Amino acid sequence: MMYQQQPKNQKQCKNIALHGYCRNSDKCEFSHELTPQQQQQQQQQQQQQQQQQQQQQQQQQQQQQQQQQQNSNGNGSNNTATSNNPIISPNSNIASPLKKSPIDNLTTSFQNLSTNQQTNHHWADHFQSGIPEYIPKQQLQQLQQQQLLQQQQQQALLLQQQQQQNYDDDQHLYPYGDNSVDDYEQHQYEPQPQPNNGIDPNMNNQFQINNFVAAQMRNASPQSYQQQFQQPNPSPQSSSQQQQQQQQQQQQAVYQQQQQQQPSSQPLAQNPSLQNNNNKLLQLQLQQHLQQIQAAQQQAQINQSYTPYPSYSQSVIRNKPGRRNIGSFFMSESLKQDILNQKSLLYLTLDPNDPRIKNIPPMLNKYHSLYPLDHDASRENQGKMFGYITSVYKAISTLDGLPYAIRRVEGFRLSSEYALQAAETWRNIQHPNIVSLKEIFVSKEFGDNSSLFFTYEFFPGSETLESKYLSQSGNPLSESVLWSFICQITSALKTIHSAGLVCRVIHPSKILLTGKNRIRMNGVGIFDVVNFDTPRILAQYQHEDLLLFGRLILTLACRSAQSTTTTNLSKSIEYVSNQYSKELYNLIVYLLTKPVINLPNIDEVVLMISGRLLQENNYLHTYTDDLETELSKEYENGRLFRLVTKLGFINERPLYDMDPRWSETGDRYLIKLFRDYIFHQVYDDGTPVLDFYHVVETLNKLDCGVDEKILLMSRDEQSLLVVSYKDLKKCIDSAFSELVSQKSHI
């Protein structure tokens, strides 16, 4: 019985699996037969190649037919120029949305090396319009999609402008257009009114979205392409501009005639109901894209248009060339008014006929001139925070003469002196957002058994967040202001928790607003003394600070003290999600969440709002620069005030060294004439010259001692003296030195 000889190895050759063939098939010891799966793949590839060849042949036939039709209808002159034609021809290799690539369905191992693929740009290129300092991971993907859509819209508008510019440059060569232009490229210049809002169901969905959004932006833009043709410019135009307008209108008429004569090359939809459904779906998608873009732009404008620290500086108005407004030489009126109000409140005292003076002692420890600061608050509300009735007074210290705020805790009996030592740590806490604790003492000056007193810094004109935002209705707080409050409180809590302490007074009634959105936490250290005997777990108390922090933000965002109750909590959070950014919503939810393990801490909050902290730092630096500018103005005014004071000491002095005419002789006479030159000049009609700029300019030149010379005239107009500012400065210094030397000898 004969047996067929078997090959040495039945394994398939790797070259067959990888490349489909083997060069050494006659010498190779492995099998070269294809598996059933490979045979199916080979058949599929052959079928795909045949289909592609058929499609290419059909496309070539269609292109030849179109060229024949266009050549028969067009001019021969249009076929001669090819290199300078700005309009793309159908045979061009440039990709077009209506030109289908012949290798779309080809799948090979080298497909990733194709040059037709989109390049992967750097991730920072998608955020050229700016992003918030902190973006949650849930929002990152949505924001990237919005940025990509905006870039596509900008590219579409730029392409249209470039094509229109190229056409205008070569209009003398092609006055009637090029008959070989595709319908798509002609619609780029003049879109025709089409049904279903201009949406073509045969085009790509993403391409239709981009075209529709670009059209909406053109219609909304005041300098769009359509308005350049249709709307006349009200401003006066030159003759060249008018000629350009007429040429553009002629181009528009030519394109309309060509599009009316040329039949549309787009195939009609076979199923009208399917076409309508697709159009409705596309319209909904487009509306959603537009709404998202508009919402993002509005939110960005709101965040960037308002700063929590408005500037004091005023815009400089120049009345004449080289002249400034008088207000630019002095402090801002608003800043001046704020300082005056604070100064007036520092020295308030009770009227002797005021009935409250009977219940206030004239002296309290080392403080006098007590003035009640919470006389308008009810007695019930004064004790709801600490469990005891409290009252606040302004008092003057006998040691340094400075005002302080003293909070009295009524009805509290101190059980141990260690309770006072527990609050001594607060005296070492110095933070710009914390009202510093200065002293704690016990006194019976109010006539009761004993009361506990806490001495704090005094900030005149301050008010609580409760009285500012919760006692009266108004518009919602700007998100910039909320983030400023959040950053300030976070900074204060970071300092408190790092020192091993707990705040526990994060409440609208205990946070003071002391300036332009500058807040300070008041009443620190009271709970450490009042609840000294209560067992403490530091981590839990610090987490309670974060819970109170979240409730405070939610209360201010809703401007309602009832927003954090059990019945209104879910509605309040929903309101924040609709009114403010996702970042603020996530922070509030994080602070109000109480997990079983791994309690949140202030360090995690700092990481969450790190971007906002940088923004707050920028605001503060800008505000500091503004205050330094105002301070520099007052420094200049102080320098000039010293000069005017010296002139006042010297001029018109009735008697000096037993000489009644001392101020009228010698160098003092020049000083008198210079005083008249500054303040007593008159116009030709006899009216006085009231020029502040002249006074400031003259005094500055005098202080510098410049060599510029001026003409001084006596009052009887009989004497004229030419003198420089440098000489006048020497005269003033010499005369003032005489006065000083005589005083030292006495």
From Swiss-Prot:
Q: Where is the composition biased (Polar residues)?
A: 196-205
Q: Where does ATP bind?
A: 407, 457-464, 509-510
Q: Record's InterPro entries?
A: Kinase-like_dom_sf, PAN3, Pan3_PK, Prot_kinase_dom, Znf_CCCH
Compositional bias annotation for Low complexity: 64-97, 221-275
**Zinc finger C3H1-type: from-to:** 7-35
Write out the ranges of the annotated region (Disordered).
Answer: 64-100, 169-205, 219-275
A Pfam family annotated for this chain is Pkinase
Organism's domain of life? Eukaryota
Q: Where in the cell is it found?
A: Cytoplasm
Annotated transmembrane regions: none
Which intervals of the chain are annotated as region Pseudokinase domain?
A: 351-610
Q: Where is this region: Knob domain?
A: 650-746
Record flagged with keyword Transmembrane: no
> Could you tell me which PROSITE patterns the record lists for this protein?
PROTEIN_KINASE_DOM, ZF_C3H1
Q: Name one GO biological process term.
A: mRNA processing
- What function does this protein fulfil? Regulatory subunit of the poly(A)-nuclease (PAN) deadenylation complex, one of two cytoplasmic mRNA deadenylases involved in mRNA turnover. PAN specifically shortens poly(A) tails of RNA and the activity is stimulated by poly(A)-binding protein (PABP). PAN deadenylation is followed by rapid degradation of the shortened mRNA tails by the CCR4-NOT complex. Deadenylated mRNAs are then degraded by two alternative mechanisms, namely exosome-mediated 3'-5' exonucleolytic degradation, or deadenylation-dependent mRNA decaping and subsequent 5'-3' exonucleolytic degradation by XRN1.
Q: Which family does it belong to?
A: Belongs to the protein kinase superfamily. PAN3 family.
State what protein this is by name.
PAN2-PAN3 deadenylation complex subunit pan3
Protein source organism: Dictyostelium discoideum
